[in-house]
């Protein structure tokens, strides 16, 4: 058995030392050959704009089929853009057709992986059957917790996406789901001491430790809408998440050239996750420039 606290944590004051991050989620766009020209253009535009990579990290999340091309280009051209995958399997290996393990992603030098994005976590509609919906939510939370543990074990930093499942959800419902994932994380890790997980007491989850992951708050009502959530709601959610556990928090959903800077520069936020507005290298470079002026 590994000693407790063998899990990936950082000192509680690390937040103040870490740079902010602007990440682009390509979703199911941009093929492997387009990815090469995209990254080359984004890189030279950032350099031409005088971007300070030491103060603001830039990351992209290509489709799985692009990752080898991205890895080769980043290594050969010494590009200072991080990258990650859009999902990961909850299993380490075996008969799981179509799934990609965390170790496979690590072998491709992925730094990050998105976990629990609402577009991955859509639930079927069960009119009037709240118990069925709750049961499915519970299973999803357990699956997500396993994905987190697989990422930790492989040395990849997960970005846990949380948000309302339906437009009628409230602030407390989103936080309840976040707590549920952490609760599953604790339950699983208590049974898998080889991973060395031990959760402390702060709000029944963590004490002064920081899980080596990020949390992206993405309300479903804002995703693909072109409109961000209310700034007050964003800050309130970021504060509530950080009160539960010491993690860095990003915002995603409706981020574009015109609202990105205001959201990015909120004191309690550690960065933004951009979708549609990151699909064109020139436009994404302009968005980054407005945030980092």
Curated annotation (Swiss-Prot):
Annotated catalytic residues: 117, 218
Top-tier EC class: isomerase
Residues bound to substrate: 25-27
Pathway(s) this gene product operates in, as recorded in its UniProt entry: Carbohydrate biosynthesis; gluconeogenesis; Carbohydrate degradation; glycolysis; D-glyceraldehyde 3-phosphate from glycerone phosphate: step 1/1
GO cellular component term, pick one: cytosol
Disulfide bonds: none
Entry annotated with the keyword Amino-acid biosynthesis: no
PANTHER family the record matches: TRIOSEPHOSPHATE ISOMERASE
Role description: Involved in the gluconeogenesis. Catalyzes stereospecifically the conversion of dihydroxyacetone phosphate (DHAP) to D-glyceraldehyde-3-phosphate (G3P).
Official protein name in the record: Triosephosphate isomerase
Species this protein is from: Tropheryma whipplei (strain Twist)
């Amino acid at each position: 058995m590994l000693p407790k606290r063998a899990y990936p944590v950082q000192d509680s004051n690390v937040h103040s030392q870490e740079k902010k991050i602007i990440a682009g989620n390509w979703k199911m766009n941009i093929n492997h050959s387009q990815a090469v020209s995209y990254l080359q253009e984004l890189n030279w535009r950032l350099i031409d704009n005088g971007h300070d990579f030491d103060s603001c990290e830039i990351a992209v999340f290509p489709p799985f089929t692009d990752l080898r091309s991205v890895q080769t280009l980043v290594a050969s051209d010494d590009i200072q853009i991080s990258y990650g995958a859009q999902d990961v399997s909850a299993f380490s290996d075996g008969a799981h057709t179509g799934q990609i393990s965390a170790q496979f992603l690590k072998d491709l030098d992925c730094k990050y992986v998105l976990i629990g994005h609402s577009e991955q976590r859509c639930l079927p509609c069960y009119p009037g059957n709240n118990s069925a919906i709750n049961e499915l939510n519970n299973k999803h939370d357990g699956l997500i917790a396993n994905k987190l543990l697989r990422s930790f074990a492989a040395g990849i930093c997960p970005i846990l996406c949380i948000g309302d499942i339906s437009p009628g959800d409230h602030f407390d419902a989103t936080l309840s789901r976040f707590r549920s994932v952490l609760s599953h994380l604790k339950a699983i890790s208590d049974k898998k001491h080889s991973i060395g997980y031990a959760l402390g007491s702060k709000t029944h989850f963590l004490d002064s430790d920081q899980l080596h992951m990020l949390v992206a708050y993405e309300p479903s009502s804002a995703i693909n809408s072109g409109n961000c959530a209310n700034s007050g709601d964003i800050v309130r959610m970021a504060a509530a998440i950080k009160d539960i556990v010491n993690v860095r928090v990003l915002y995603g959903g409706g981020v574009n050239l015109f609202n990105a800077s205001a959201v990015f520069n909120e004191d309690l936020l550690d960065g933004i996750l951009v979708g549609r507005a990151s699909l064109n290298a020139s436009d994404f470079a302009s968005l980054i420039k407005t945030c980092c002026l």
